[in-house]
Amino acid sequence: MVKFIALITAAGSGSRMGEDIPKQYRPLAGKPMIYHALRTLCGIARISTVCIVLAPEDTEWIRHNWREFAGKIQIFNCGGATRAESVTNGLKALRAANHVQDQDWILVHDAARPGLSTTLVERLLDQLADDEVGGLLAVPLADTLKRADDAGRVICTEPRERLWQAQTPQMFRMKLLLEALEKAPAGITDDASAVEALGLSPKLVVGNAYNFKVTYPQDLKLAELILRERAIT
């Protein structure tokens, strides 16, 4: 039977946050940031395993209590210098541990997207389980885009029709994803880009604005509000 396996990338340093600890461990709504996505993914019955890819030198993970997820999580200290390297290393570690088959689905998620909801994950699974390629959560672009010159002057306004903002999870079969990442050009920033480079067209599944990536310190307040509101409702 084909399995669904989640893989959370958590090997980054979070340098843009200006913190002494990696961003994924930054306290958020009373828990480390990574906890919120981990809880959502572990709560999905169709997902058999949630793998967390940490940096080899990570010392923060063991400082926290993860017992509630025992039996469903797998830790790999094999993160690389880039997101693509971390995902590639995680997939190879899964294969070496005999936890995955070529046709199993892999859902790659960023630890810094704590606003991921059960509804979004279930929607992704429903819409992609029988897809030939796979796909990703994304939201149609709402903001007006300006292209600038080197002096910070507007060159033109870019049309936003058919433009989407990529989110995670991004879901592809194990064999395809590993092949795509191993052949990917330098500088790719997500898994879908690697698959696109093979000439394939991933499917866009509508996400929502709550599933944004926490990147800068000011993002933390918004993420905190979202998570606390969710806890109340």
From Swiss-Prot:
Pfam family, one: IspD
Record GO biological process: isopentenyl diphosphate biosynthetic process, methylerythritol 4-phosphate pathway
Annotated InterPro entries: IspD, IspD/TarI, IspD/TarI_cytidylyltransf_bact, ISPD_synthase_CS, Nucleotide-diphossugar_trans
Reactions that this protein is recorded to catalyse: 2-C-methyl-D-erythritol 4-phosphate + CTP + H(+) = 4-CDP-2-C-methyl-D-erythritol + diphosphate
GO MF term list: 2-C-methyl-D-erythritol 4-phosphate cytidylyltransferase activity
EC code(s) of this entry: 2.7.7.60
Site, Positions MEP for the nucleophilic attack: residue positions: 160, 213
Gene3D superfamilies: Spore Coat Polysaccharide Biosynthesis Protein SpsA, Chain A
UniProt keyword annotation of Nucleotidyltransferase present: yes
Organism superkingdom: Bacteria
Annotated site location: Transition state stabilizer: 16, 23
Keywords: Isoprene biosynthesis, Nucleotidyltransferase, Transferase
Class in the EC hierarchy, top level: transferase
Pathway info: Isoprenoid biosynthesis; isopentenyl diphosphate biosynthesis via DXP pathway; isopentenyl diphosphate from 1-deoxy-D-xylulose 5-phosphate: step 2/6
Function: Catalyzes the formation of 4-diphosphocytidyl-2-C-methyl-D-erythritol from CTP and 2-C-methyl-D-erythritol 4-phosphate (MEP).
Similarity comment: family membership: Belongs to the IspD/TarI cytidylyltransferase family. IspD subfamily.
NCBIfam families: ispD (TIGR00453)
Name used for this protein in its record: 2-C-methyl-D-erythritol 4-phosphate cytidylyltransferase
